């Protein structure tokens, strides 16, 4: 399996393209000078295009992914607000954007050529939405609204239109600040990291995918931590055995084991990472974590112990300024 790692560095307006070896080493393939401050990224399900949200001219840049993993710009399209998080539906027909500062979410069609075009829908009235996450049925979009302490739920129809779900929202603890999400591969459980109180919530998903119920909340910080909690990102291994979160104040990755059915998390430990880890990801083999240090200007590579989930630091690599997003492609 050939794997390509994309790292977005907004302060230098660059995307660094790396090849990940089976041993966890990175080789730089390309440095892309981007048309703006590159922030969130998403890969098309068919692995032919990479989408990048940019500012200050709010928009999406579509890049064609070449056979070797390098990028060629294929198009640009506007967005209604500064893109905080982007994702696609599971079929690659629509791109969703959440704008924290714009208090909105939007839907943009993806053409047959893989290029994103202008939005067909904008949903206003969201307070600080931080991500847009399609559920395993591809029929429900979950939008954590950090300042509402709610995850808003929207039905997605075949024409790409979002409408409020019958369960309009899932409520978190007061002051939690829901931010990013991950799903178990069995489609029965979802996980949300909460930025402000430094916790992770586990939600049970009903059989038809129509209802989310909170079943567990766990602290992501060590017991002796007394600073300001500032959680950022969350990812689960492809086999569903281990889940990881990041905190930017302590600059740590927290390691959780996941019960076989996905319903219960247990803290395994904590691993130091690059300074201010706003974004990280797990490779498709489930063997490596790659974490970006927004203040260090580096990415760190960590090997996952397949029995415990604990991390071993392998290496660190310089990237651009303010790296904040990591996306990984398997070819």
Swiss-Prot record:
Metabolic or biological pathway, per its Swiss-Prot or TrEMBL entry: Carbohydrate degradation; pentose phosphate pathway; D-ribulose 5-phosphate from D-glucose 6-phosphate (oxidative stage): step 2/3
Lineage: Bacteria, Pseudomonadati, Pseudomonadota, Gammaproteobacteria, Enterobacterales
Organism of derivation: Serratia proteamaculans (strain 568)
EC number: 3.1.1.31
A single MF term (Gene Ontology): 6-phosphogluconolactonase activity
The protein's enzyme class: hydrolase
InterPro entries to which the protein is assigned, alphabetical: 6-phosphogluconolactonase_YbhE, Cycloisomerase_2, Lactonase_7-beta_prop, N2O_reductase_N, WD40/YVTN_repeat-like_dom_sf
Family: Belongs to the cycloisomerase 2 family.
Entry keywords, A to Z: Carbohydrate metabolism, Glucose metabolism, Hydrolase
General function of this protein: Catalyzes the hydrolysis of 6-phosphogluconolactone to 6-phosphogluconate.
Catalytic activity: 6-phospho-D-glucono-1,5-lactone + H2O = 6-phospho-D-gluconate + H(+)
GO BP field: glucose metabolic process; pentose-phosphate shunt, oxidative branch
Gene3D superfamilies: YVTN repeat-like/Quinoprotein amine dehydrogenase (2.130.10.10)
Top-level lineage group: Bacteria
Pfam families: Lactonase
Record-given protein name: 6-phosphogluconolactonase
GO cellular component, one term: cytosol
């Amino acid at each position: 399996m050939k794997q390509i790692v994309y790292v977005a560095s907004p302060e230098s307006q660059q995307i660094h393209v790396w090849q990940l070896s089976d041993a966890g080493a990175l080789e730089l393939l390309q440095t892309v000078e981007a048309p703006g401050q590159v922030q969130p990224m998403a890969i098309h399900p068919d692995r032919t295009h990479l989408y990048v949200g940019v500012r200050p001219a709010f928009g999406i840049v579509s890049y064609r992914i070449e056979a070797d993993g390098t990028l060629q710009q294929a198009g640009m399209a506007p967005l209604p607000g500064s893109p905080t998080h982007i994702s696609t539906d599971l079929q690659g027909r629509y791109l969703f954007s959440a704008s924290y500062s714009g208090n909105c979410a939007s839907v943009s069609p993806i053409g047959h050529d893989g290029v994103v075009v202008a939005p067909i829908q904008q949903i206003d009235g969201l307070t600080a939405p931080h991500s847009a996450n399609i559920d395993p049925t591809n029929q429900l979009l979950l939008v954590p609204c950090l300042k509402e302490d709610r995850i808003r739920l929207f039905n997605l129809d075949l024409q790409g239109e979002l409408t409020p779900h019958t369960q309009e929202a899932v409520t978190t603890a007061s002051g939690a600040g829901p931010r990013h999400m991950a799903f178990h591969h069995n489609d029965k459980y979802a996980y949300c990291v909460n930025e402000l109180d430094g916790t992770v919530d586990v939600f049970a998903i009903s059989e038809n995918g129509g209802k989310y119920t909170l079943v567990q909340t766990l602290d992501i910080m060590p017991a002796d931590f007394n600073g300001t909690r500032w959680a950022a990102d969350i990812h689960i291994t492809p086999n569903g055995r281990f889940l990881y979160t990041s905190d930017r104040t302590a600059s740590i990755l927290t390691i959780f084991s996941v019960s076989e059915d996905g319903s219960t998390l247990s803290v395994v430990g904590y691993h130091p990472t690059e300074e201010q880890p706003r974004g990280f990801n797990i490779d498709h083999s489930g063997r490596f974590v790659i974490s970006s240090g927004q203040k260090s200007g580096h990415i760190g590579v960590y090997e996952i112990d397949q029995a415990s989930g604990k991390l071993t630091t392998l290496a660190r690599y310089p990237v651009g300024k303010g790296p904040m997003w990591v996306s990984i492609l398997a070819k």
